[in-house]
Each structure stands twice: as structure tokens, then as C-alpha cells.
Amino acid sequence: MAVDIECRYSCMAPSLRRERFAFQIAPKPSKPLRPCIQLSGKNEASGTVAPTVQEKKVKKRVSFADNQGLALTMVKVFSEFDDPLDIPLNITELLDSIVSLTTAESESFVLDFSQPSADYLDFRNRLQTDHVCLENCVLKDRSIAGTVKVQNLAFEKTVKVRMTFDTWKSFTDFPCWYVKDTYAGSDKDTFSFDISLPEKIQSYERMEFAVCYECNGQTYWDSNKGKNYRIIRAELQSTQGTAQPPNGPDFEIAFDQFGSPRCSYGLFPEWPSYLGYEKLGPYY
């Protein structure tokens, strides 16, 4: 029996013998295997939560050498850019326009008084009393221009504007020129002036002027009822604001020598003046 098994085994091909009796030996694991089944669901179902171990993190801190009494490795002081900044052209133009606009606003001036001829009745009374009165005044680029009305007391007459640019530390007299008026009566004459403003005016100085009328050896002044005609910077006008009218009505009615009430300052302040709503042009 043993002989038959041995002969049968020896008669087999080598490949058949290896495939039939060969087997693999699994290597011995070096580390213990972890179970693939997790028990988290079981713990959650039972209502118990496995405790987790919280690791304590170490906070990071930054300290400099000079705080520890040591010397710094390198110290560099920046005074100017080594290379010029390459600013785009459109941004450069925008910055230049903003600077120029700010400068122009700070150098612009406005009139600090209303047009005298806006209230026709008051203007006529002042002309009758003082014999001279500023009619209109406008500010142009760097000049001030206007017209003056005077009573025709004599043929020979002189009209001038006395103006100061440094709060009356000094002043200059600017002559006015006669303007032929077709529609004006023979009892009134019109003069005009055009005064150039200095290039540099100190911000703390005031610009003021008054009108002088000389005739028959007499001198008459229009100083805006003692306040003078002032020219201020535009930025000051925005900060000062406009005066608020009184809450109650003014029942004081002033009558002029011509018998007409001054409705502009009497019972009817809301009525428009003779000139109209704009109140910018001459009364005639």
C-alpha cells in the first residue's frame, strides 16, 4: 500500500505537486490589529459618551531681542523711497485736480452783504438821505465790479471807492467812471467801478470798502450804515451761516417821504420787492 502511494506521487509532474500541496504561510504581525468594529453607536444608543482626552495646547509667544536685553540683528531706517513710486497717470491727475480744487475753494471770495438795490424802497430812502448809495456789486475771477447811484447836486462831481485789503491798516481810493443812463432822470447819475484783487490776501485780514461822493465842496459817504461792505472767503460764509429771522412778526411800519409803506420790513415781509424774486439787477 505504501508502495502504491509513493509510485503515484513520484509519477506526478512537478508543477502539479507544487499546486496541490503548496500553501502560503502568513507573516506574523508585528503590531496587534485594531478591531474594525467601532463601539460609538453602541455607546450613543446606551446614552453613555466615551470620555475624550483633551490635549493641552501650548500658547505661542513672540518676543524680541531688545526686550530680552539683547542686541537686534539689523536696524534699518527708511527716510525716502529708494525707487520712485510708479503711480498710474489717472490717479495722479485725480490727486492734482483735488489739490487744485481745494486751493481754489480756499482762495474764492463772496460778498458778505445783500445787493442794496434789492429793496427798492430802502435803496431810494438811502439815496435821498445820504445822496450816494451802492447800487449793485458782483465778484468776478479776481476783481470786484459794481455801480453807484448819486444825486445830481452839481455838474462837477467825483465818485470813488475806498477799499482796504488789510483791515484798514492801509487803504486805496479807486475812481469811478460816469455811465450814461438813457432811462434815468436828470436828478440821478450812475457811476461804475472795476477793482482788481491782490494775488495774495492773508486769511486773517478783512477786505472792506465804502463809497465816497464829493460835490460842491462836500463829501458824502455810503458805508453800508456804518458796517462797510465786506468781502470774505467762501469757507467763512459756510461756517457763519445766515441770520435767522425773528419768530414773531414785526409790526413796525416805516413810511418814507413819498407816502408808501416799506412792505419789505413791515407787515408784509413775504411780498416780493419791486425788483422781483431774483433781486440781483438794478431797480430801473
Swiss-Prot record:
| The organism of origin for this protein | Bos taurus (Bovine)
| PANTHER family in alphabetical order | PROTEIN PHOSPHATASE 1 REGULATORY SUBUNIT, PROTEIN PHOSPHATASE 1 REGULATORY SUBUNIT 3B
**Presence of the UniProt keyword Phosphoprotein in the record:** yes
Q: Which GO terms describe its cellular component?
A: protein phosphatase type 1 complex
Q: Name one GO biological process term.
A: glycogen metabolic process
Q: Which InterPro entries match?
A: CBM21_dom, CBM21_dom_sf, Pase-1_reg-su_3B/C/D_met, PP1_3B, PP1_regulatory_subunit_3
What this protein is reported to do is described as:
Acts as a glycogen-targeting subunit for phosphatase PP1. Facilitates interaction of the PP1 with enzymes of the glycogen metabolism and regulates its activity. Suppresses the rate at which PP1 dephosphorylates (inactivates) glycogen phosphorylase and enhances the rate at which it activates glycogen synthase and therefore limits glycogen breakdown. Its activity is inhibited by PYGL, resulting in inhibition of the glycogen synthase and glycogen phosphorylase phosphatase activities of PP1. Dramatically increases basal and insulin-stimulated glycogen synthesis upon overexpression in hepatocytes.
Residues forming the CBM21 domain are 124-232
* Identification of the protein by name: Protein phosphatase 1 regulatory subunit 3B
One annotated GO molecular function is:
protein phosphatase regulator activity
